[in-house]
């Protein structure tokens, strides 16, 4: 919910920072959005190894407070380059949702794992759907900078909740033999199906995420210049 609030307001924030043309707004928004996910792809294996050694709870806490700080810093930027830089740093500390999945999968009784993961997916989807709408409304009501501050506070609250209420019975696993790709294929009968699913998910993500940096810019270009509640319309 907190993170998805930013989807409709990030391009408009660059306009407030002095980026005027639609092309430049789309470019900066694409850089800021893509920077985070690019870094996430690069550092995810590293954080995964840390989680395997230290537990998943520490990953939740690190990600929550790290993203909270990043969003608070974005609220005080005065140039587009500063926003992109902090979004790069945000990618370094991300990983909340993936850590949540592994934590639930490892801590929930086996007969309740499907139910728990389904509940988590429903909560994540609900937040993703409602977040842009509320984020756009808040941006029009209290200002984009204050919206970033609010997102930072929400992420900080999630960190506090993770620290206080999540209890993990984690025991590091003994060192296991590293599998080659050929051995991995032998152990997973449906390996090719999993690869196909990953490719399909990759294509789906490209289609969805390619629109996120430009949808607000597109709407700004087709509505009258004096239109109020532009962020709310974009979020809807």
Task: Write out the residue ranges for each language-model feature.
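Pair of pore-lining "gating" transmembrane helices in MFS-fold secondary transporters
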Residues: 1-16, 191-210
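Juxtamembrane intracellular "pre-TM" segments in multi-pass secondary transporters
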Residues: 168-197
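Conserved MFS/SLC helix-loop-helix module at the cytosolic interface between two early adjacent transmembrane helices
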Residues: 41-78
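Cytoplasmic helix-loop-helix junction between adjacent transmembrane helices
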Residues: 86-124
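Residue-level signature of mid-helix packing/kink "hotspots" within the transmembrane helices
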Residues: 37-45, 95, 128-129
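Loop-to-transmembrane helix entry
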Residues: 20-35, 224-236
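Symmetry-related core transmembrane helices of the 12-TM Major Facilitator Superfamily/SLC fold
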Residues: 147-164
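Hydrophobic core of transmembrane alpha-helices in multi-pass small-molecule transporters
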Residues: 70, 81-95, 202
